[in-house]
Amino acid sequence: MIIDWYPGHMKKARQQIIDLLPRIDVFLEVLDARLPASSANPVLERLRSDKPCIKVLNKNDLADQQVTKQWVSALQSQQGVRALPLEARNRAEVNKIIGLCRILAPNRGRPGRSLRVMVVGIPNVGKSTLINTLAGKKIARVGDKPAITTCPQQIDLRNGVLLHDSPGLLWPVMDNPDGASRLAVSGAIGDNALDYVAVALYGLAFMLDRYPRQLRERYKLSEETTDPGEVLESIGRKRGCLVSGGQIDSYRAAEVFLRELRAGTLGRISLEQPDDVAPVDSNDD
């Protein structure tokens, strides 16, 4: 699956990030804990250069805990990177970020020398929710649709830390087929840019391979059901996703599956492991 989807505001956001870079002390990149590599924008990685970075693995409550431990180890092997799994609405977990920022930029955060933190991430990874929790009030708009934040914001946390929010930023062409498909399954890409049924079939094939027990228990599938198309049809029949003549409405069945997978109804699922992922070209020229 090759996805070419780059709204105009994202090109503008990239330039805004570049303009702010000289003033930034720490990067705070918000990732989806279920797919930390695919939800990491390689353009942002290149832009931050050697600035210290905290990679927040948000939606940790939805991810496979054992796989998340592997990701923390893999990410912290990178120069200047600290990894922190959390759930963005959990204030106690989120408050750990400030302490890490002070460790990474020890000469900042004092009177007259604010510690400036740029919060970055692709759409729909929970960046706005995290900012609201850090601020202790609603600052950024929150929703389950990608690309809600469209202009930069500066938020003074009143503790010597200034947050610089930026719009969710995808890269111009996502030509890594598996990475693009995993992003689509997670909901990071607007569903109107996708073949929804194809996304569901990819997700079902993944579940049959990695988490077959959870899939079969949720939808009462037999052990003999191993084809993603058959599973989608079974889900459609059992959930009443039918059209005239008793045929399956594949789109509605896909909606049921993807909605439940994204919400964690199928259990704690990680969509990729460190060994699954090859380096991604930023393609930002």
Task: Set out the residue ranges of the language-model regions.
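Glycine-rich phosphate-binding P-loop
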Residues: 117-142, 166
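Canonical P-loop GTPase G-domain recognition
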Residues: 54, 60-121, 139, 240-241
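Helix-rich effector regions associated with P-loop NTPase G domains
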Residues: 1-27, 34-35, 40-53, 60, ...
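Short, well-ordered alpha-helical segments in soluble proteins
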Residues: 101-108, 123, 134-138, 146, ...
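Generic structural marker for isolated residues within well-ordered, non-membrane alpha-helices
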Residues: 72, 128, 232
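Solvent-exposed alpha-helices and their adjacent loops that cap or buttress functional pockets
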Residues: 111-112, 133-134, 155-156
